[in-house]
Amino acid sequence: MKFKNILVVLNPSNEKQYALARAVRLVEEQKNETKVKITALLSVYDLSYEMSALLSSEERSEMHQQVIEKHRHAVQYYLDKYANPEIELQSHIVWNSNEADAINEEVENNNYDLVVKYTKDEEKLTSLIFTPIDWQLLRKCPIPVLMVRDGDWKHPRRILVAVNVSGEQEYQDEFNQELVETGISLAENLNRGNVHLVAAYPSAPINMAIDLPEFNTSGYENGIRGQHLINMKALRQKFGIDEDHTHVREGFPEEVIPEVAKEIEAELVILGTVGRTGLSAALLGNTAEHVISKLSCNLLGIKPSKKDD
């Protein structure tokens, strides 16, 4: 996967503009045959400009434009800073009180293939701080969304792909392949990148063992684990991934995935996201929000190209 048309969401309160820095670095490490387009989007709004009943709609529109031009001048500094002959850099400043709506409208009206946005990283906390705007974007955005916490790619560049190898639904196998292919492509684009796979499988229901004393808990769990291991082996062999780069563990995805990401010091976690039931992952049911809230690394959220019925 090579990104050709990237939308970067600027953060007006972050002078370092990590999202733009990360996007530019990603493009620089791709082997591009043609120029890559990066659009820096900034959503601005000031309620005080809407409060005056004395202003005509024309006057209000003119004031909006003045504010936009002021911010456009400030954004130009970053376009100049990251100028690169391989990149067509441009800015788009919009007046909108809802940043998430502004982003989604921009995506709907243009052929972007990636959105990059900075999300807060508190030193005293062990996870990223996702804002309501971040959640809305991950839920609704139809294209991949890269949430970053800083501006550079670390070495070694370990990419952890979360997959569902339960084999319960056919579309999951196709989606697993999409996710792994994305991870491998990014690893190839990012020098010294390597891919790990992770899958979680459930424990035996406690109430089942209580209600059915004859129920073989150990046999059930061994069977579930065995099936996940077989399916994971088939997936990793399909892509030539080493066995020691696959992780199949008992537990909830929201515990297993962040745990493995921390252990291998993952630079990026790739998750599947499906917006029809809030934010969820096809591989994770409705637990993706819990997974994401516990991650301390960058996140790439991807929706399946083929929707499940």
UniProtKB/Swiss-Prot annotation:
Major place of residence: cytoplasm
InterPro entries xrefs: UspA (IPR006016)
Cellular component GO terms, alphabetical: cytoplasm
Pfam families per UniProt: Usp (PF00582)
UniProt keyword Repressor, yes or no: no
Intracellular or extracellular location(s): Cytoplasm
Keyword entries, A-Z: Cytoplasm
Family per similarity comment: Belongs to the universal stress protein A family.
Task performed by this protein: Required for resistance to DNA-damaging agents.
This protein's name: Universal stress protein E homolog
Organism: Haemophilus influenzae (strain ATCC 51907 / DSM 11121 / KW20 / Rd)
Lineage, highest ranks first: Bacteria, Pseudomonadati, Pseudomonadota, Gammaproteobacteria, Pasteurellales
